[in-house]
Amino acid sequence: MKLKPLHPLILLLTVSFLMLTSSFITKVESSEETGNMTNDELLRNVFSAIDNLKTIRYNLQCNERIKGRMQHTESKVKLQVVPRKLYLYIKGIEVLWCEGTNNGNALVNPGSFPYINLNLDPNGSLMRKDQHHTINEMGYHYLEDIIKDGLRKVGDKIDKNFILLGEEKYNGRVCYKLSITFPDFTWNSYTVKKDETLITIARKLHVSEYMILENNSKLDWYNDVKEGDVIKVPSSYSKLTLLLIDKEYMLPVSNKVFDDKGLFETYEYYDMQVNKPFDQKEFTKGFEGYNF
């Protein structure tokens, strides 16, 4: 049987319908991949999860660029948010810090010579050497402040700078992948004010004090500045940040940070336990299994 050719108008309508259907299916599949989540909704959920965080346990793998080379560490962390209490174990080294105790110092078992417990300032040279951060920045509130500052910087351009890239499996768990970009990342001149240090400057600008130290070769330490000095500071915390956000906990479990030189730092969280109450003895030096 010989088929009659389709009328041009019918053919045009058929093609148009197929194109529209194809476009609709593509959009639905893309939306379903992130459960119709927008970047703005995702960030609100992340901030809510952080603000409702009471306790957390996790294993942390950390890579930080120190003097041009990536330095790797692994640690086990127990953290209570309020009042802030922290226990940290790194290859035989133990750190215990509890808010309002020990004159603000951390109790440290060095696990080696001098084989005695030490009381150390978390911001001091012994605890801070070759580290991007101190124990004071552990947890998520520091990261939350940096992200919120990034939102203030981009204003109504959130969809250009904060991009939800879909979902990705991480350590067997489903995560949202979020890209935060500042393509205009640059270095600016900053005049040091009275009583400022690199740490107070970094907190004010929501940038990394280690990055400032690394890029001002004349400075030896974080307090090596005085009023009137002119230093270089970054325009934002990063040029690119890639976050994997656990779909259940709504907390970042992977954080990769890039600056104008490349990879700056990565933090990867494993075996997280969120809001599981602690036995308060776990924040005492005599707790079973500790070696203080």
Report residues per predicted region:
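Bacterial N-terminal signal peptides
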Residues: 10-21
